[in-house]
UniProtKB/Swiss-Prot annotation:
<keyword id="KW-0045">Antibiotic biosynthesis</keyword>
<dbReference type="InterPro" id="IPR003099">
    <property type="entry name" value="Prephen_DH"/>
</dbReference>
<dbReference type="InterPro" id="IPR036291">
    <property type="entry name" value="NAD(P)-bd_dom_sf"/>
</dbReference>
<dbReference type="InterPro" id="IPR050812">
    <property type="entry name" value="Preph/Arog_dehydrog"/>
</dbReference>
<dbReference type="GO" id="GO:0070403">
    <property type="term" value="F:NAD+ binding"/>
</dbReference>
<comment type="similarity">
    <text>Belongs to the prephenate/arogenate dehydrogenase family.</text>
</comment>
<dbReference type="InterPro" id="IPR046825">
    <property type="entry name" value="PDH_C"/>
</dbReference>
<feature type="compositionally biased region" description="Basic and acidic residues">
    <location>
        <begin position="257"/>
        <end position="275"/>
    </location>
</feature>
<feature type="domain" description="Prephenate/arogenate dehydrogenase">
    <location>
        <begin position="6"/>
        <end position="284"/>
    </location>
</feature>
<protein>
    <recommendedName>
        <fullName>4-amino-4-deoxyprephenate dehydrogenase</fullName>
        <ecNumber>1.3.1.121</ecNumber>
    </recommendedName>
</protein>
<dbReference type="GO" id="GO:0004665">
    <property type="term" value="F:prephenate dehydrogenase (NADP+) activity"/>
</dbReference>
<comment type="function">
    <text>Involved in chloramphenicol biosynthesis. Probably catalyzes the formation of 3-(4-aminophenyl)pyruvate from 4-amino-4-deoxyprephenate.</text>
</comment>
<dbReference type="GO" id="GO:0017000">
    <property type="term" value="P:antibiotic biosynthetic process"/>
</dbReference>
<dbReference type="GO" id="GO:0006571">
    <property type="term" value="P:tyrosine biosynthetic process"/>
</dbReference>
<feature type="region of interest" description="Disordered">
    <location>
        <begin position="254"/>
        <end position="288"/>
    </location>
</feature>
<keyword id="KW-0560">Oxidoreductase</keyword>
<comment type="pathway">
    <text>Antibiotic biosynthesis.</text>
</comment>
């Protein structure tokens, strides 16, 4: 048994809500899916209702529920906190799947300080499956319901990782907002270079193949979802600024002049200050020594594990047991 004889999943017709609804049902919970619109061709698959203004049938379900899980957009979830928690019985658990935590923490403090609550943010696409994958868990108010739900996630193969609301938003600004910005900026740079992607794919060393694959994966997703991640996290703008500043620092380190457009015909011009032979030139390799040392310290004990992971990834790309590409 799931620990939740009766559960309500709001937004359960969507990918994330559907994943949790399935997990609850498999564990024996009587799970009611609530949505504004039923899935196409399945008018009886859910209770149609507005969780921000519950009608009589939805209100009754919320009163009886041992768990109410909000798998909806942040705006809807925040508006739902007050009306939903007023209906929930003592001891019931409120959960949500928001990708930003600080707003929900403030809303709960204002309207439902005594309600058990945990936020679950699956750090993967639901289609990939939960087995072995991390689920960020932010506990606002602990209790038996929180323990039961985290145990249910573990039983479904997930790996709950506990974070505070502040830690969550700071971490996901790097793991999601920064990562997506890097990948899409890489694609924009390719477009500006005017390169033939077919030629790239045919000649690319493993690191470039991985970046092309990541770009292709992101482009297979929803622009709305990726845009929402960039806009909703209060720390995402800082992550993008850090990326832009890091690229400017790297360019300066190598010897680029940001005020002068690159001219391929001047590559060997002895008067260029970024020419290694110029008295004021820049020895990029020498300057990179310090960068490499700094980043090796940043990686710490994860450096060796990351190198092993990358080697395994490259082997998978080439379907071989011996991958010799190391520096390119």
């Amino acid at each position: 048994m799931s620990g939740f004889p009766r559960s309500v999943v709001v937004g359960g017709s969507g990918a994330v809500g559907g994943m949790f609804a399935g997990l609850l049902r498999e564990a024996g919970s009587r799970t009611l899916v609530v949505d504004l619109v039923p899935p196409p061709g399945r008018p009886d698959a859910c209770l149609v209702g507005d969780v921000t203004a519950p009608g009589p049938e939805l209100a009754a379900a919320l009163r009886d529920a041992d768990l109410v899980l909000l798998a909806v957009h942040e705006d809807v979830a925040l508006k739902a906190v007050a009306p939903v928690t007023r209906l929930m019985r003592p001891g019931a658990l409120l959960a949500d799947t928001l990708s930003v935590r600080t707003g929900m923490a403030a809303e709960l403090a204002a309207h439902a300080p005594g309600v058990q609550h945990v936020g679950l943010n699956p750090m993967f696409a639901p289609a990939a499956g939960m087995t072995g994958r991390p689920v960020a868990a932010v506990v606002t108010r602990d209790g038996p319901g929180v323990t039961a739900l985290l145990r249910l996630v573990e039983g479904g193969g997930g790996r709950p990782v506990r974070l505070t609301a502040e830690e969550h938003d700071r971490t996901t600004a790097a793991t999601q907002a920064l990562t997506h910005a890097v990948i899409l900026s890489f694609g924009l740079a390719l477009a500006r270079l005017g390169v033939d992607v077919r030629a790239l794919a045919a000649t690319a060393p493993p690191p470039h193949q991985v970046l092309l694959a990541l770009l292709a994966r992101v482009l297979g997703g929803s622009p709305e979802v990726y845009g929402d991640i960039q806009r909703s996290n209060p720390r995402a703008a800082s992550a993008r600024r850090a990326l832009a500043e890091a690229l400017r620092s790297f360019a300066a380190l190598i010897g680029d002049d940001p005020d002068r457009a690159e001219d391929p015909d001047r590559a060997d011009d002895p008067d260029r200050t970024d020419n290694p032979g110029h008295p004021g030139g820049c020895d990029g390799a020498g300057n990179l020594d310090g960068v490499f040392e700094e980043l090796r310290r940043l990686m710490g004990p994860e450096l060796a594990a990351g190198q092993d992971h990358c080697q395994e990834l490259f082997r998978t790309l080439h379907r071989t047991d011996d991958e010799g590409e190391k520096d390119r």
